[in-house]
Amino acid sequence: MAAASSVLRCCLLVAALMTLSAMGAEAITRQYLFDVQTTSVTRLCSTKSIVTVNGQYPGPTLFAREGDHVEVTVVNHSPYNMSIHWHGIRQLLSGWADGPSYITQCPIQPGGSYVYRFTITGQRGTLWWHAHISWLRATVHGPMVILPPAGVGYPFPAPHEEVPIMFGEWWNNDTEAVISQALQTGGGPNISDAYTLNGLPGPLYNCSAQDTFKLKVKPGKTYMLRLINAALNDELFFSIANHTLTVVDVDALYVKPFTVDTLIIAPGQTSNVLLTAKPTYPGASYYMLARPYTTTQGTFDNTTVAGVLEYDDPCPTTAAGKIVPIFSPTLPQINDTNAVSNFTAKLRSLASAGYPAAVPQQVDHRFFFTVGLGTHPCAVNGTCQGPNGSRFAASINNVSFVLPATALLQSHFAGKSKGVYASNFPYYPLNPFNYTGTPPNNTNVMNGTKVLVLPYGANVELVMQDTSILGAESHPLHLHGFNFFVVGQGFGNFDPINDPAKFNLYDPVERNTVGVPAGGWVAIRFHADNPGVWFMHCHLEVHMSWGLKMAWLVLDGSRPDQKLPPPPLDLPKC
């Protein structure tokens, strides 16, 4: 059943791509209906009710071309508040459609609906959509395939076939109950029971062999795998036995191609990779494996998800009943930070005439953010399960973000920020310390709903520094509303005197989600040309739940095409 469903998905993808190819060069409006509903799903011999879109897990793939206008009507038939984020879509002048609850919109209440309207401007590649409230994105997510305009090819040889590969994370228990319990006790949440590949855990888990994704390939053909990490809390190593992968795109942005045996992909990130099948039938199958990368000192899901790469047999009748061998790749160690660093160092923008790297050469505003864990004190006479009887927290510049009761963007647009948010997010740590050395004795963080205000058109440089508080850890930071250039990164404390001289301002990789290295720092630059309120947060869901998030408020520009339009009439109310 599961193998058949994987074949059906590939057929649907091919059919959709053929339909898009047959359409003219002019941009069109593409309309989708998302029915958010509860669905019974069985994995690991355990059946539970999950929230899905259109009864599918993972959800449906959205197809569009660069320049198209997209309208997605979301009808909420689930018992939970809901909102959908179109991860990586720039949302130029359409911030009302970005999706994070209480940032750009109030959530869609049960029984309600909302139409997300946006235009895909200057983007092509693999992105994805997901719920952006609580932990509902565990099952409410799906791919977005954005093709170049009709008649425009890829800057690499066209593949024989394109296949979305979506990594996820599965709990036998209700994920809303998992995070609710963690927030009540102040401790860490229960870890997941499995990872998934296109919704299937694969044969390495008990009672799961029937739920295995299988990719059928023809000898000598090249396939483009559209990789998406939709896992909640884990970065993943990925490899296919006895095959190499050529990376051609990350976060829907072309890169200079390079070939690897293993890649790293963090939650929120996407990557297009080319897989060239062996020239002749090998008489074997090959595992596609993914397992976590982590430097955390706490518990985590140390399991491996497997799919199977199978070759079409040119002589299936003579091979009937014959069991072919299956090979497994060797993945890096769980905590192999060097493997991660070596991979990320290879990423460079294509920086060609057709796809230039518009790196801001001059900077108007510089910021320095610490990102990491911390604590809140336990309530008087309370019992908490965090470090030393405290409650786990997380922060940026020691501010643990608290979601407001109404949406920031609505409050800003109406000029009613009082009592909703403050515009004094710190530009740098108020109490500097040796960030990657011995942590301070006081690990408490402050709560706040603070934004950082930017003038329209500002060129921004931001250095994000990991801290050793409660252990050095990699943090995948996602910025809504913008792509950014990763101009530098390193280990230890950022050196503001010497490190900027090493920045790559020629062809740095451009992304929307970047890993702040464990025990290190990363520097990014972006051009603030999109008015609105834009969320920035760790894409490890547990860290975001603990407060590792903030918001940028980009003011309107002077021209009409630099001003955020009024909200749509059907925007949900709190």
UniProtKB/Swiss-Prot annotation:
It is found in: Secreted, Extracellular space, Apoplast. It comes from the Eukaryota. Cu cation 2 binds at residues 87, 130, 539. Its cofactor is Cu cation. Keywords: Apoplast, Copper, Glycoprotein, Lignin degradation, Metal-binding, Oxidoreductase, Repeat, Secreted, Signal. PANTHER family: LACCASE-12, MULTI-COPPER OXIDASE. Belongs to the multicopper oxidase family. This is Laccase-12. It comes from Oryza sativa subsp. japonica.
